[in-house]
UniProtKB/Swiss-Prot annotation:
GO terms for cellular component: cytoplasm. The gene is aspS. GO terms for biological process: aspartyl-tRNA aminoacylation. This is Aspartate--tRNA ligase. Its main location: cytoplasm. It comes from Haemophilus ducreyi (strain 35000HP / ATCC 700724).
Length: 589
């Protein structure tokens, strides 16, 4: 027997028992007559000690290094009262070593567990980094989340059904990872960006409640919360309304937070996309932050200040203000930094006004734009924003998208900088009623979610007549500013699906080539269906309290989509490429 107990499970009830432990040497203290070691496994740490009276054991112990892998056999004894360590779960006991087996000693480590290592070092030696307590706890939490989800789904009648990994490239918003076919030379499979079409086909097959915890792949630029391969909790249902799907999934997340964090998230508020963008400048608003954007175009549309009046009177313009309580203490340097920050989002400047004394009229206002705005305008601004003495107002005026993005980002930054965002709170919500389409950089229409999302209360002819005004029957779950899940009611009418493809500029030939199987399937008694997908990585990131998604994935990629440990991606063997009928235009190094 290699192990009788996990290290972290030993306690006073085991005193007097003989135990066999297997794990790693965490720390070593040589006190001359005794050598004390902390032995670690996935469940925790326990202290063991060697007595010099046993020369053989003592000699072995003196040659061990940190992170050596060992087996310890010994007797559990109670610590003296003065030696109890309340900071250790096993701090009331220790193990007198009676035998030791060294599975493998360790060389000098390339990581220092007692200090912060660079992320590059951590990813290169990931197998060592995962031995750290925090990382081990993150992965254990992830495993418990997936176990919880499987139990919940099983209890609610869902079937876990696998869908293909090698599939057909379809336009879903990001670039595909392609896999060449050896048998069908010149042809490629695509790794799925999501199981979207397959889960809809399962609904057409009669499996009315499907779920899968599944790997997905997107070849896109990475961020702190994005990876080229990620894991979804994928869900699809038939004969349920959007409201019923949301209720079912809200209950799952509510129950998960209770299970993992003992936190009651309460009832999730529902907010329209328009409301979220208007008040928070984001379709995933962080409601822990009390700051809100206030539109003032009607107040400033007639002022003799082109920076304000032009966007205030433009169809695609927006003028808004962000009130920051007690913000008048901000220095000019800080304000300049915020001006540079909004420029990242295309803003040409950042007007501001400090409210020093409301009762003093214009003399109580400090602002570089005060000369363009009279007392009547400022009084209207103060009334609408409920500004108080000591506040500062930041103004955004430009095209709607620029102002919304810039002021939304500024809201978040100021919330963090001035500690206005409650880091201890949990603020979930649903965002609904998204636009069905948006315009890309060239003015063409694209699907805001994906082209299989149904519109709200429109016939195909009505949708075709004015697509830009169409509202999608879509919904996103947002927690603390992160989109943790998103879904929609799907199109189940072949005419509606063809109408959407036409609006997106997909001609009939491409429709048949890329989606012919779907259009055919829609003709044979397709049920109404709706679904949702959660990002497992992002959920785990929130529950564990980390801000880096790589901390909740065992072997993640860098922001350059590379694995530093295995050195993937790598060049392929020329002979293999020849078998695949592939020729590269890049010379191998």
């Amino acid at each position: 027997m290699m192990r009788s107990h996990y290290c972290g499970t030993l306690n006073r009830s085991h005193v007097g028992q003989a135990v066999t432990l297997s794990g790693w040497v965490h720390r070593i203290r040589n006190l001359g007559r005794f050598i004390f070691m902390q032995i670690r496994d996935r469940e925790g740490i326990v202290q063991v000690f060697f007595d010099e009276k046993d020369d053989t054991l003592f000699k072995v112990a003196s040659q061990l290094r940190a992170e050596a892998c060992v087996q310890i056999q010994g007797q559990v004894i109670a610590r003296d009262e003065a030696q109890i360590n309340p900071e250790m779960a096993t701090g009331e006991i220790e193990v007198l070593v009676q035998n030791v087996l060294v599975y493998n000693n360790a060389e000098v480590l390339p990581l220092d567990f007692n200090q912060n290592n660079t992320e590059e070092q951590r990813l290169k030696y990931r197998y060592l980094d995962l031995r750290r307590h925090k990382m081990a706890e993150n992965l254990k939490t992830r495993a418990k989340i997936t176990s919880f989800v499987r139990r919940y789904m099983d209890e609610h009648g869902f079937l876990d059904i696998e869908t293909p990994m090698l599939t057909k490239a379809t336009p879903e918003g990001a670039r595909d990872y392609l896999v060449p076919s050896r048998v069908h030379k010149g042809k490629f499979y695509a790794l799925p960006q999501s199981p979207q079409l397959f889960k809809q086909l399962l609904m057409m097959s009669g499996f009315d409640r499907y779920y899968q915890i599944v790997k997905c792949f997107r070849d896109e630029d990475l961020r702190a919360d994005r990876q080229p391969e990620f894991t979804q909790i994928d869900v699809e249902t038939s004969f349920l309304t959007a409201e019923e799907v949301r209720a079912l999934m809200e209950n799952m997340i509510h129950s998960l937070w209770l299970d993992r964090l003992n936190v009651d998230l309460g009832k999730f508020p529902i907010m329209s996309w328009q409301e979220a963008m208007q008040h928070f400048g984001s379709d995933k608003p962080d409601l822990r932050n009390p700051l809100e954007l206030v539109d003032i175009a009607d107040i400033v549309k007639n002022v003799e200040f082109n920076v304000f009046n032009e966007p205030a009177n433009a169809i695609d313009g927006r003028v808004t203000v962000l009130r920051v309580p007690n913000g008048a203490t901000l220095t000019r340097k800080q304000i300049d930094e915020y001006t540079q920050f909004v420029a990242i989002y295309g803003a040409k400047g950042l007007a501001w006004a400090k409210i020093n004394d409301i009762n003093a009229g214009m003399d109580g206002i400090q602002s570089p734009v005060a000369k363009f705005l009279n007392a009547e305008i400022f009084n209207a601004l103060i009334e609408r924003t409920a500004a108080q003495n000591g506040d500062i107002l930041f103004f955004g005026a430009d095209k709607w998208q620029v102002v919304t993005d810039a002021m939304g980002a500024l809201r978040l930054k100021i919330g963090r900088d001035l500690a206005l965002t409650d880091q201890t709170a949990w603020k979930p919500l649903w965002v609904i009623d998204f636009p069905m389409f948006e315009r890309d950089g060239e003015g063409n229409l694209s699907a805001m979610h994906h082209p299989f999302t149904a519109p709200k209360d429109l016939s195909p002819d009505q949708l075709a007549a004015d697509p830009i005004k169409a509202v999608a029957n879509a919904y996103d779950m947002v927690i603390n500013g992160y989109e943790v899940g998103g879904g929609s009611v799907r199109i189940f009418d072949p005419k509606m699906q063809q109408t959407v493809f036409n609006i997106l500029g997909i001609n009939e030939q491409d429709q048949q080539e890329k989606f012919g199987f779907l259009l055919d399937a829609l003709k044979f008694g397709t049920p109404p269906h709706a679904g949702l997908a959660f990002g497992l990585d992002r959920l785990t990131m929130l529950i564990t309290g980390t801000e880096n998604i790589r901390d909740v994935i065992a072997f993640p990629k860098t922001t350059a989509a590379a694995c530093l440990m295995t050195e993937a991606p790598s060049y392929a063997n020329p002979q293999v490429l020849q078998e695949l009928a592939i020729q590269t235009t890049v010379e191998t190094e």
